[in-house]
Amino acid sequence: HGIGRIKKYDIYSEQLPDSFDGFRIAFASDFHYESRFGKKRLPGLLKALQAADADLLLLGGDYRGRNGGNLSELFDVLYQVCVPYGTYGVMGNHENNANYEIVRQEMERTGIRLLEHQVDTLWKGNQYILLCGIRNPFDLTKNGISPTLSLQAEDYVIMLTHTPDYVEDVDVSNTDLALAGHTHGGQISFFGRYTPAHFSKYGSRFLSGLKYNSAGIPVIITNGIGTSRKDIRLFTPSEIVLVIL
């Protein structure tokens, strides 16, 4: 038992430089390690990430579960994934207080680049795409101005944000594709209540899959990793997303 599925999206954009045609991005989010996703499923995670054969690995936040858990075990596995363009991550709402520093240190230890309202450039020959990571997307007072606003419309820009709400809450102009998690695909709670509204103020609009904000910008929302069908998942398999540009 590892990951329920690898969900593949082929994304076309006229903005994409020719040399990035076929570029493969693996995206994993919402691990909640040792809360819903434990040590025995780590080999399955590694196998799925390696099978994705990605050029770039992106992490969408919520690494540690409520029960704690030794995050070094999770990050050791992420470190083993071979991706030519490296691994980048953002923080989720569970990375608060002490958790934030624990995750930051694990990222530093394993060479994962944390993007907090920052943009990095990925080069292929003399062409490039831009990767933008959003710092705490729930705090719009501090983080309500998207870093993409200072970029050029002709650039190809990928945004990594923990919650999909961010692409609707604020102006994310110049973004060509956003990747988000947080919703868990609208899992059923222990009490049998549907919980999508708990995860997104927009109800089921940004629940799972490929959606669009009001400006027509595509956002892919993953169900996440830290779930198991025998625990509290119903019809929402855990997944890794594979985006092919």
Where do the PLM segments sit?
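N-terminal membrane-anchoring alpha-helices
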Residues: H1-L16
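Membrane-embedded segments
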Residues: S19-R113
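Active-site metal-binding loops of divalent metal-dependent hydrolases
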Residues: A28-Y33, G61-Y63, N93-H94, Q118-V119, ...
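Binuclear metal-dependent hydrolase catalytic cores centered on His/Asp/Glu-rich metal-binding motifs
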Residues: R104-I112, Q118, K124-T161, V167-E168, ...
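Conserved beta-sheet core of the metallophosphoesterase superfamily
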Residues: P164-V241
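Short beta-strand-to-coil "C-cap" segments at the C-terminal boundary of structured domains/repeats
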Residues: V243-L245
